[in-house]
From Swiss-Prot:
Pathway: Purine metabolism; IMP biosynthesis via de novo pathway; 5-amino-1-(5-phospho-D-ribosyl)imidazole from N(2)-formyl-N(1)-(5-phospho-D-ribosyl)glycinamide: step 1/2. Its main location: cytoplasm. Mg(2+) 2 binds at D122, D273. Substrate binds at S99, H100, N101, H102, R121, Q245, E317, T318, Q319, S535. This is Phosphoribosylformylglycinamidine synthase subunit PurL. It comes from Staphylococcus carnosus (strain TM300). GO terms for biological process: 'de novo' IMP biosynthetic process. It is found in: Cytoplasm. The keyword Isomerase does not apply. The keyword Manganese does not apply. Monomer. Part of the FGAM synthase complex composed of 1 PurL, 1 PurQ and 2 PurS subunits.
Length: 729
């Protein structure tokens, strides 16, 4: 009698069970060709997750190849658990962003928590100690109960995991739009620091070397999680709650500390997190990168309950697990270490020279697959795109009611203060946070030095929807400006591409054009892509999200002394750097007045971005600028109001713009506060006003004046989200 009751080879083919797992007929036939026979149930499951969109990037790989991935600073780029970039003194910064969109839509707390846990393990698997977390979130409008529930759950999950494991959440962004109803975006980023000689790779090599499993015992949670993340959300998605993993931050903390100790052992050959596709992806990818084979004895895998089959073990996405390859004969040294940290561990296999991926359970073979086709030869699909029709109509902005629009935009949750939400995150644990949440970028000191790492995470949606190529440039440039605004030198970036179904021509074209724009911006701004993630099929009931590329970018501050007095003071002069044009297409103003965004804006000049960026950075480092704020969503008037509300300072400004241009979202602009007695030596910079301590906010363009108490602004800006979130459900 067989140990495990599973469908037969004949049943799999006759009933097309492979289709339920995510394989097409053509893909199944390709598996048959690779194996030279019909696959069994476990093998079908393994191919289905490894060839899923989430793991193989089969619809996006051609576009990812156009991203620049090297520079004088890049030590390790795409292909490993995270990117590694040199910061001098034989140290490096390690970082990556990942999505956990589908799980968060079904189980918001655990979906978000495990997203945080997974990205932390990616950083730790390189050998780096995490120093901070960031997140980029998108939800539907908060007037819907479902969206409030998702927002609460996701924010609580992020805070719950990060706070318990002891890593501060220092920056992020949150936006709200009906296009994310039922399909939130949860993108988590982690940044770590490592010494050059501690950098690890996920590789399995050395015939006879042992494979060690460490972490939580394997259960049935998260089975086919990678496949689930590669499908559209539907009414049936609720039934896939078992595909959502369960996180345990306390075990995560133990695993992190044990791993960081294990990397100091010279006998460690390779290490990889068990993330999407669990034991399957970690083991097969390590073997492929090592040019080796691997034999795993699944009866040695620590399991949570009796009767878990090889199929379930290989596809489980139980959290808090790592896979190591260690030199033969040194296994006990590692097992003793993990025992000291109260972690389950076991030797479950060895590296071979067969280039085959072999799984046995009590000597019975459950899979025998060539490594390279499994890990590296998933089919790649190049589809046909179709550009969205250009809107040639004109919107009328000649009679904008400035004061009415001003208050409505300031109170919109996308623009309003997110303090109510991010206060749930521990921002200071570790005591190295220099700049707390609320500004454009976070700054975290590199312990034992006077250096700091600045990091930011930024997404773009409406502009990418309207004009994908320009929108792609914009999202990279926005992250670049946010680092410049704290005086950092941008080094490199990670990206998460969140889109709908690539099988829809318009969405596929958005993917083509926006990644082309991103690649161009990366080249000009000298910010290579060192890691990333793709999340497609973000659709609910046939409606796609806006195409939303998210960029995480890091920069270096060589000496943080200037940050000791980097905040505005009464008496500072305010300057506007950058030109204000009639850029209303895709703006908050267009959405407010016309209910949708379907017009284009001016092209972004990347060479100007570099020139202005260097000038701004010099003003900061020369001690002339006391504060820099990028002009973002809502435009110039909203940016000044946010500045005033955040710092509790008055503003007296006169702007040479029309009423509508007060809300223009022209790219490449900064507000610079310059210390009393100093001047800003930047060509075409306009002095527009003064920082006051009179509690008054006053901005005029000679035609219209907006005047409010700063306390009133603060009530509107700070109070908007709490009011939405505490509405009666």
């Amino acid at each position: 009698m067989p140990k495990f009751i599973e469908p037969s080879i004949e049943e799999i083919k006759a009933e097309k069970l492979y289709s339920d797992m995510g394989l097409t007929d053509a893909e199944y036939d390709k598996v048959v060709d690779i194996l030279g026979r019909e696959p069994n149930f476990t093998e079908v499951g393994i191919f289905s997750v490894m060839w899923s969109e989430h793991c193989s990037y089969k619809h996006s790989k051609p576009f990812l190849k156009q991203f620049p991935t090297t520079s004088e600073h890049v030590l390790m780029g795409p292909g490993e658990g995270a990117g590694v970039v040199d910061i001098g003194d034989d140290q490096a910064v390690v970082f990556k962003v990942e999505s956990h969109n589908h799980p968060s839509a079904i189980e918001p707390y655990q979906g978000a928590a495990t997203g945080v846990g997974g990205i932390i393990r990616d950083i730790v698997s390189i050998g780096a100690r995490p120093i901070n977390l960031l997140n980029s979130l998108r939800f539907g409008e908060l007037d819907e109960i479902q969206n409030r529930t998702l927002t609460r759950g996701v924010v609580a999950g992020i805070g719950g995991y990060g706070n318990c494991i002891g890593i501060p959440t220092t920056a992020g962004e949150i936006e709200f739009d009906e296009r994310y109803d039922g399909n939130p975006l949860v993108n988590a980023m982690c940044v770590g620091i490592i010494d050059h000689d501690m950098i690890q790779k996920g590789t399995a090599k050395g015939v006879g070397n042992s494979v060690i499993y460490v972490g939580l015992k394997t259960g049935r949670d998260g089975i086919h999680g990678a496949t689930f993340a590669s499908e559209e959300l539907s009414e049936e998605s609720e039934s896939k709650r078992p595909s959502v993993q369960i996180g345990d931050p306390f075990v995560g903390k133990k695993l992190m500390e044990a791993t960081l100790e294990a990397i100091t052992f010279p006998e460690l050959v390779g290490i990889q997190d068990m993330g999407a596709a669990g034991l399957t992806s970690s083991s097969s990818e390590m073997a492929a990168k090592g040019g080796s084979g691997m034999h795993m004895r699944l009866d040695q895998v620590p399991v949570r309950e009796e009767g878990i089959s090889p199929y379930e073990m290989m596809l489980s996405e139980t959290q808090e697990r790592m896979l190591l390859v260690v030199e033969k004969g040194t296994e006990q040294k590692f097992l003793d270490l993990f025992d000291k940290h109260e972690l389950d561990s076991a030797v479950i296999g060895e590296v071979t020279d067969t280039n085959r991926f072999v799984l046995t359970y009590e000597d019975e073979v459950y899979a025998d697959i060539p490594v390279e086709p499994l890990a590296d030869e998933a089919p790649v699909y190049i589809l046909e795109g179709e550009e969205k029709a250009h809107n040639t109509s004109k919107n009328d902005y000649s009679n904008v009611d400035v004061n009415d629009v001003f208050k409505k935009l300031l109170a919109h949750p996308t623009i309003a203060s997110k303090r109510y939400l991010y206060e749930q995150y521990d921002q200071q644990v570790g005591a190295n946070t220099v700049v707390k949440p609320g500004l454009q970028a976070s700054v975290v000191r590199v312990e034992g030095t006077n250096k700091a790492i600045a990091s930011t995470i930024d997404g773009e949606a409406r502009y990418v929807y309207n004009q994908p190529y320009e929108g792609g440039k914009m999202v990279v440039a926005e992250a670049y400006r946010n680092l410049i605004a704290v005086g950092a030198t941008p080094l490199a970036m990670t990206d998460c591409l969140n889109y709908g179904s690539p099988e829809k021509k318009e969405i596929y074209q958005q993917l083509i054009d926006s990644t082309k724009g991103m690649a161009e911006a990366c080249e000009v701004l000298k910010t290579p892509v060192v890691s990333g993630n793709v999340s497609l099929y973000n659709e609910t009931k046939g409606t796609s999200i806006f195409p939303t590329p998210v960029v995480g970018m890091v920069g270096l501050i060589e000496d943080i002394d200037y940050l000791n007095d980097f905040h505005p003071h009464a008496g500072d002069k305010l300057y506007l750097v950058g030109e204000t044009r009639n850029d209303f297409g895709g703006s908050q103003l267009e959405k407010l007045l016309y209910g949708k965004v379907n017009h284009e804006s001016e092209a972004l000049d990347l060479s100007e971005e570099v020139e202005k960026g260097e000038q701004i950075k010099k003003a900061i480092r020369d001690g002339k600028a006391s504060h820099v704020q990028t002009v973002g969503k809502g435009g110039l008037l909203i940016t000044l109001a946010r500045f005033s509300a955040f710092y509790g300072l008055g503003v007296d400004a006169k702007l040479d713009v029309t009423d509508a241009q007060l809300f223009s979202e022209s790219q490449g602009r900064y507000i610079v506060a310059v210390k009393e007695g100093q001047t800003l030596d930047i060509p075409n910079a306009q002095e527009i006003g003064t920082v006051k301590d009179n509690g008054q906010f006053k901005v005029t363009n000679g035609q219209t004046t907006v005047e409010e108490n700063v306390s009133t602004l603060n009530e509107i800006w700070e109070g908007a989200i709490p009011q939405c979130m505490t509405s009666a459900d």
